[in-house]
Each structure stands twice: as C-alpha cells, then as structure tokens.
C-alpha cells in the first residue's frame, strides 16, 4: 500500500517501474511459450515425417510386389 505524503512524481516513478517490469515479465513469458511451441512443432513435424516415410515405404513395397507378380505372369505366357 502506498503511504500518504508521497509526491505525484514518486507515484509516477513507481507506476512506470511496475509497468516496465510487467512488460519484461510478459516478454519472458512469451519467449518461454514460443520456445515450448517451437519444440512441440518440431516434435510434431518429426512424427509426421516419420509416418509419411512409413507410408511411402509401404506403397513402394506394394508396387514392388505388383511388379514381381506381373513379371511372373509375363514369363508364364
């Protein structure tokens, strides 16, 4: 609580002090949040890339199987 008898200049200084401190705290919070979101984004992209590679490999294996079957059929003709 602010004591009576403080000058308006002192009150203004105190107000600015808390305002600047609040901005720094907000910046720190935002930077920490951004860092966590960037890490999560990297993790999600890695998982998506891994899943994409699995699907791609599976499709390639399917195509190879079809190719082998067609070659067998052609040889039997």
From Swiss-Prot:
InterPro entries: ATPase_A1-cplx_e-su (IPR012508)
Keywords annotated in UniProt: ATP-binding, Hydrogen ion transport, Ion transport, Nucleotide-binding, Translocase, Transport
This protein's name: Membrane-associated ATPase epsilon chain
Pfam families, alphabetized: ATP-synt_E_2
Family: To E.hirae NtpH.
Domain of life assignment: Archaea
Taxonomy of the source species: Archaea, Thermoproteota, Thermoprotei, Sulfolobales, Sulfolobaceae
Annotated GO biological process: proton motive force-driven ATP synthesis; proton transmembrane transport
Transmembrane intervals: none
Species per Swiss-Prot/TrEMBL record: Sulfolobus acidocaldarius (strain ATCC 33909 / DSM 639 / JCM 8929 / NBRC 15157 / NCIMB 11770)
Gene this chain is encoded by: atpE
Subunit structure: Sul-ATPase is composed of six (or maybe five) subunits: alpha, beta, delta, gamma, C (proteolipid), and possibly epsilon.
Enzyme class label: translocase
